[in-house]
Amino acid sequence: MARFKADAEPIFMLLCHHPVVEMTLRFEIFPEDLDATVDFYMRVLCFRLTADRRDQREQYVSLERGGVRVGALRSVVPDVRAARLPPAGVELVLEVDDVVAERDRVTAAGWPLAEDLRERPWGPKDFRILDPAGYYLRITDRTR
């Protein structure tokens, strides 16, 4: 397997024989309590609710802030819920322009920090929180 370096753009262009289209990220989570999830993402992280189907059998919401979209499904099928518990070893990283202001907003909303602001050896400054369902979020300075 080839090991690429950060400046491998010319090699990348040779390997990709088809045009590369833009990609965005939407992550899906599977909390038990959609109301708590909506409250957290709207009140604590200032997302806006873009779809609300909590009145349906398969309850679903979609939230958005900037280029980040979060879908949350409360499935009525037990096997689906069990298979999608918060994963260990995964952190969802949200980049912001002002990580200090973001931390201050989170703490002002009364949300506990899993880890306070810290400068990392690899460069960025970040803090960490858990959402109501236990998903681990790292909020960090935007990488340039």
Locations of regions flagged by a protein language model:
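Extreme N-terminal basic, low-complexity initiation segments
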Residues: 1-9
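Active-site beta-strand termini and strand-to-loop segments that position acidic
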Residues: 63-66, 129-132, 142
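N-terminal beta-strand motif that seeds the catalytic metal site of vicinal oxygen chelate
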Residues: 8-38, 90-92, 140-144
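Vicinal oxygen chelate
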Residues: 32-35, 89-136
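Short loop/turn microsegments at loop-to-beta-strand junctions
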Residues: 25, 58, 124-125
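A short acidic/small-residue loop/turn micro-motif
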Residues: 78, 121-122, 142-144
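Core segments of cupin and vicinal oxygen chelate
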Residues: 28-70
